[in-house]
Amino acid sequence: DKTKMISEWDTNGDTHTAYVKFDEDANYDWSVSYQNKAGKSAEKVDVSEQKTPYKFTVDKTSPSLELTYEKNIWSELLQTITFGIWSKSDVEVTANAKDDISPIKSVSYHKYNGDTALGEKELDELYNNGEFQEHNAPIKASPGEQAVIYGRVEDYAGNYTYVSSNGIIADNTAPKITFDVSPKNKYGKIYNGDVDVTVGVND
């Protein structure tokens, strides 16, 4: 409702003042004019020292971010990490950012090798310390890595959002199987009693 944006006029002699409040998320393009009772219009306002007084954006809503790997889609900051993504080759996580009002300023990521979820305060510290990298390609976890991908998107209004993937394990090393037969038989594979076979798997 535009009528709620403008306050009532306050008159002090020949000076009339009203306040216009832009408090809803939107891209604003507006103008101002005034005409007195004699039909005389005000001169054009000098705005040469102001950047964009008649065209600006109010955006108080954080942008959204999706991290995607195959059929897995993450769109929030997970509070609990479980390592449910397994692969024997590279795992490439794609980031897709969206903002309905402001343009996207940056998308960055941090590859975390721990096994507990990080909160927003911890992620802010990592970001401020330069631990996030600008995103310009799929984010990769290579064989031999255990990782959680943290994404960060920021718009030009300064709003930002963190999103995390679930735990990822990339492993291209084949497991090793061992057998141990007890008791040992120096005469070969024929026994006249019980045989215990211990099977071991190392991965």
Name each model feature, range by range.
Residues D1-D203:
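Low-complexity, disordered linker/stalk regions enriched in Pro/Thr/Ser/Gly
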